[in-house]
Amino acid sequence: MADSQNQGSAEPSQAAAAAAAADAAAAAEEVMAEGGAQGGDSDSASSDSDGVVGQMAEEPQTPAENAPKPRNDFIESLPNSVKCRVLALKKLQKRCDKIEAKFDKEFQALEKKYNDIYKPLLAKIQELTGEMEGCAWTLEGDEEDDDDDEYEDEEEGEEEDEEEEEPAAEAAGTAAAKDEGPHSAVPDDAKK
């Protein structure tokens, strides 16, 4: 009884594989009719794909067989229907590349055209804005750098003093809070 169930489930998968092969053959024929790819017989392609499916089900592959092969060997090992589709896709990609190159050329020409139109306007803008006008303020970079260094030294000294004062103030604040009740706690801002 288990054999009849296994055979029943195997038949739909074989039918599905045959249908997939037929679809691939039909797609290859469409491509060939459009002049998109060169390839072998679609009948031999479908029989090849059925044979490959049967071999894969019967024999498990060793790790060496699963290793990636060089690209040419991989393409040669594909069924004819797949090869036809790959070639058709390559040709379509070349067509897309040609269209994209044409677009880029036209886009560059359009940019150049409008840059030429903008040149007089940009010249007028430059004329109106002109060069920087002189002013009474002078930049004294050396003196500012010296002042900055002195200011930074003063800040570091103040920060060290504040760090020493903070722990003492916190300890005094917690001691005062313990002595007083919860209602006597007044924020520091309110005391000032």
Curated annotation (Swiss-Prot):
Pfam families: NAP (PF00956). The keyword NAD does not apply. Residues 1-76, 136-192 are annotated as: Disordered. Residues 1-12 have a biased composition (Polar residues). Its main location: nucleus. Residues 15-28, 40-55 have a biased composition (Low complexity). Gene3D superfamilies: 1.20.5.1500. It comes from the Eukaryota. InterPro entries: NAP-like_sf, NAP_family. Residues 177-192 have a biased composition (Basic and acidic residues). One of its GO terms (cellular component) is nucleus. GO terms for biological process: nucleosome assembly. Belongs to the nucleosome assembly protein (NAP) family. This is Nucleosome assembly protein 1-like 5.
